[in-house]
Amino acid sequence: MAKTIQAIRGMNDCAPTESPLWQWIEAQVRNVLNSYGYSEVRMPIVESTPLFARAIGEVTDVVSKEMYTFWDNDEQLTLRPEGTAGCVRAAIEHGWIYNNEQRLWYIGPMFRHERPQKGRYRQFHQVGVEVFGIANPEIDAELIMLTYRLWKALGIDQHVTLQLNSIGSLEARANYRSALVGFLENHQDLMSDEEKERLVRNPLRILDTKNPELQKVLDNAPKLLDYLDDESRTHFEQLCSLLDAVGIQYEINPKLVRGLDYYNKTVFEWVTSALGAQGTVCGGGRYDGLVEQLGGHATPSIGFAMGLERLVLLVQEVNPNVPAKSAVDIYVVYQGEGATLAAFELAEKVRSELPHLNTMLHCSSGNFKKQFKRADKSGATLALVIGESEVQNKQVVVKHLQGGTDQQTLDLVNIIDYLQTQF
């Protein structure tokens, strides 16, 4: 026997038993985003490497350590590690945002070469939302309200907490960076080699360190909110007022900076304690300078991304009885002379007249006992049974597989009307 080939570490398959929950979550996402008037876009999973270096920042962990990059002739390409840069590239290239507001969303796989662990994979799936052309804090609040509405739809709203911060303008961050470095230089004895490197290259990233001793020291560090420019402070205060007005609770986290260099002003995360160390389920913020940085006109922008794998884990943890619909509603079994053709005709009739139902035809050998066993395994609600006598009498037997009434025999001409009463 030939040696089997396994999936790449950190890149996982989704089994038939798992996909109904994924589909249900994705359906809730689509429903909420569509209800807010957002439009779906689709971008390639491969982009030019310089796009991410310019957008995310060359000193970030994502660009310096985690990207899957390769050469195609003389062009360096990368599997996308996140979606914002590609969406901005597409918006500039196709003129979607020239003198225009856009509210966009996308869904798809992303890739990062990280150490796989629960909730963190090398191929993972994200829903991303990007808004272009609106500078007011009202849109910041709308995105947060949108995510909260999604949490309610998923039944997880009591298990997530909103954390907010403002990281201000580039100038304000530069002033804060100097103060933070001055403070941290006296505590390098507590730092790992990686943290010492961050102190030089990207000191704000030390704020989300997992080092417990350094976390205690940071409680007394300068606060970014104390260095905000007036515009950023006013923007943040207005955002908080809007959230207060609609009753969305939040915590101001002065250590929240996000991991990508393009953010400014508002940053936010939805976190949970139900998943252990990997507690962030959604994060985003404003990136008002990114469009211009990538060659477009100056355009105020804001967005967020949420990881579907973590949403799946969270829903399974706190809402295990989620009504994930079975992939099959009706299972058609048949045996005997003439039954095959009759079963095919019946299955197609049901599919044509009741397209909202999922109908599976057995299409395999086996007696009725084996076919019913397969029907039970499919999760179907009903089995439609055709044997030789049913063919001769133009009838069909209906068997309830999930309890309920006993089986009954109906004329074929009445089967559609009957099924409409059952679903």
Swiss-Prot record:
<dbReference type="InterPro" id="IPR033656">
    <property type="entry name" value="HisRS_anticodon"/>
</dbReference>
<keyword id="KW-0963">Cytoplasm</keyword>
<dbReference type="Pfam" id="PF13393">
    <property type="entry name" value="tRNA-synt_His"/>
</dbReference>
<protein>
    <recommendedName>
        <fullName>Histidine--tRNA ligase</fullName>
        <ecNumber>6.1.1.21</ecNumber>
    </recommendedName>
</protein>
<comment type="subunit">
    <text>Homodimer.</text>
</comment>
<keyword id="KW-0030">Aminoacyl-tRNA synthetase</keyword>
<dbReference type="InterPro" id="IPR004516">
    <property type="entry name" value="HisRS/HisZ"/>
</dbReference>
<dbReference type="InterPro" id="IPR045864">
    <property type="entry name" value="aa-tRNA-synth_II/BPL/LPL"/>
</dbReference>
<dbReference type="Pfam" id="PF03129">
    <property type="entry name" value="HGTP_anticodon"/>
</dbReference>
<dbReference type="InterPro" id="IPR015807">
    <property type="entry name" value="His-tRNA-ligase"/>
</dbReference>
<dbReference type="GO" id="GO:0005737">
    <property type="term" value="C:cytoplasm"/>
</dbReference>
<dbReference type="GO" id="GO:0004821">
    <property type="term" value="F:histidine-tRNA ligase activity"/>
</dbReference>
<keyword id="KW-0547">Nucleotide-binding</keyword>
<dbReference type="InterPro" id="IPR006195">
    <property type="entry name" value="aa-tRNA-synth_II"/>
</dbReference>
<dbReference type="InterPro" id="IPR004154">
    <property type="entry name" value="Anticodon-bd"/>
</dbReference>
<comment type="similarity">
    <text>Belongs to the class-II aminoacyl-tRNA synthetase family.</text>
</comment>
<dbReference type="GO" id="GO:0006427">
    <property type="term" value="P:histidyl-tRNA aminoacylation"/>
</dbReference>
<keyword id="KW-0648">Protein biosynthesis</keyword>
<keyword id="KW-0067">ATP-binding</keyword>
<keyword id="KW-0436">Ligase</keyword>
<dbReference type="GO" id="GO:0005524">
    <property type="term" value="F:ATP binding"/>
</dbReference>
<dbReference type="InterPro" id="IPR036621">
    <property type="entry name" value="Anticodon-bd_dom_sf"/>
</dbReference>
<dbReference type="InterPro" id="IPR041715">
    <property type="entry name" value="HisRS-like_core"/>
</dbReference>
